[in-house]
Structures are given as structure tokens and as C-alpha cells.
């Protein structure tokens, strides 16, 4: 276990893995570390945005860069090139109110993944994105919702933010178990041919419709659902 924002710790983990695999190529690297921050543009701090980006994007960069040789950039290693699997989110394609920091990190991860996927054709290292919808993990429970909403007692967004936080709880209840993501990741590593991106989302149809509607209509639908009313 190591902190993906600590570049030294990431490099130390490479040594541990190298001792295990010897001169073989590493079959796969799964970048799953992530966290979520909720709040309005008025209240979120630059530090919160930075921490969100450091974990969800720079952490992935550190790991991808550090493990490249083991995955196949070192041509002296034996075996087939490995695969990089980056766990993104449907929040990497649909921006939601009060999740701008999280959206930023996941949109960034999607662009990073697409860029290096094309670069790493040089070594035959495939890069695949898994984009989950709601998953039964405590990613949003780490936010003390009562305290967070209390911060907005005198804000126009108080009621809307409270509703958004309740929605995250409901989404977790209908979410897939984490094992579904783990099984997909293992399947990708074991398969010769894969798609570049897999969306695993129990609310798939709802999100597809949001993307099909004109942006202004989707904006109004989301605003109504979250009680974001101009005052």
C-alpha cells in the first residue's frame, strides 16, 4: 500500500513488483486510487481542487510513468506487453453540479488516457479506460454531509447541495458491487483484443439520454432535479 501522490513511494513499489516478476513483463497496471470532493464554485478552495487533481490524475501519471519499463518499454524483458487500465467515471463525460472538482479530474484522466494510448502503440502497451457509474463504495461518505451542508446555511445553494448529497447516497444503493469492476479489469488483462473504453453503469440509459439531449435542455433537467432555481 502506498500514496500515489508520493512519487518516491510509487518508485519504491516498482522495486517490490520487479522482485516478484524477475525478467518478465508485467501483465497489467490498474490505476484505481481516487477520491471525490463536493461543493460549489463559491466555496471550494484551490487546495481542494489541487488535492483532487493530485490523486485522480497526477497519481495515475506517476504510476504509468514508473511502471512503463516493466510493462514493456524495456524490450529486454520477456513476454507480451502489459496493459494499463485507468478507472475513470461517467463523471469524465457528464458534468454535474457541485462536482466540478471531481469532473475536472475525471475529464482530465480521460484525455490523459487517450493521449498515452496513442503514444504507447510504440511498445504495444494497450491503455483501456473503465468508466463506472455508481459503485457501492464509500467515496462520498467520507464527506461529513451535515457539516458540509451547514457551511451553506446562508447560501443560495444550501437546499440544492443537500439534495445533491442525498442523491449520491441513493446512487450508491443502486450501484454495482466493486467486484464487477475487478472482474472486468481482469478480463481486459487476459484478453488479446479490447475496446478502448468500457462504461459499467447501472444508470446507463439515463446518462445516455442526458448526452443525447441538447445541452440547454439537459441543463434545465438537471437543475430541476437538484432544485437549482434562479433567485
Language-model features and meaning:
Residues 1-12, 46:
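The beta1-alpha1 cofactor-binding region of Rossmann-like NAD(H)/NADP(H)-dependent oxidoreductases
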Residues 32-37:
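Conserved NAD(P)H cofactor-binding loop of Rossmann-fold oxidoreductase domains
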Residues 40-41, 48-50:
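Substrate-binding pocket helix/loop in short-chain dehydrogenase/reductase
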Residues 42, 94-100:
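Active-site loop immediately N-terminal to the catalytic Tyr-X3-Lys motif
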Residues 64, 105:
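Active-site helix of classical SDR
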Residues 89:
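Residue(s) in the substrate-gating loop at a strand-loop-helix junction
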Residues 119-172:
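C-terminal beta-strand-loop-alpha-helix "lid" module of Rossmann-like NAD(P)-dependent dehydrogenases
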Amino acid at each position: 500500500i502506498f500514496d500515489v501522490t508520493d512519487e518516491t513511494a510509487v518508485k519504491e513499489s516498482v522495486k517490490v513488483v520487479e522482485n516478484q516478476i524477475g525478467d518478465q513483463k508485467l501483465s497489467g497496471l490498474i490505476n484505481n486510487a481516487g477520491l471525490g470532493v463536493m461543493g460549489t464554485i463559491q466555496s471550494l478552495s484551490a487546495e481542494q481542487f489541487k488535492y483532487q487533481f493530485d490523486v485522480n490524475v497526477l497519481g495515475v501519471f506517476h504510476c504509468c510513468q514508473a511502471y512503463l519499463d516493466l510493462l514493456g518499454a524495456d524490450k529486454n524483458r520477456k513476454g507480451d506487453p502489459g496493459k494499463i487500465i485507468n478507472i475513470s467515471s461517467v463523471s469524465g463525460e457528464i458534468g454535474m453540479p457541485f462536482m466540478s472538482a471531481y469532473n475536472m479530474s475525471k475529464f482530465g484522466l480521460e484525455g490523459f488516457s487517450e493521449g498515452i494510448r496513442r503514444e504507447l502503440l510504440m511498445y504495444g502497451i494497450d491503455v483501456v479506460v473503465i468508466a463506472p457509474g455508481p459503485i457501492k463504495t464509500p467515496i462520498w461518505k467520507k464527506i461529513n454531509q451535515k457539516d458540509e451542508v451547514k457551511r451553506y446555511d446562508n447560501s443560495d445553494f444550501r437546499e440544492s447541495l443537500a439534495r445533491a448529497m442525498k442523491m449520491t447516497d441513493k446512487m450508491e444503493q443502486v450501484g454495482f458491487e466493486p467486484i464487477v469492476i475487478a472482474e472486468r479489469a481482469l478480463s481486459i488483462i487476459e484478453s488479446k483484443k479490447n475496446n478502448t473504453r468500457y462504461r459499467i453503469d447501472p444508470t446507463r440509459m439515463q446518462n445516455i439520454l442526458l448526452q443525447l439531449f441538447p445541452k440547454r435542455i439537459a441543463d434545465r433537467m438537471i437543475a430541476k432535479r437538484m432544485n437549482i432555481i434562479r433567485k
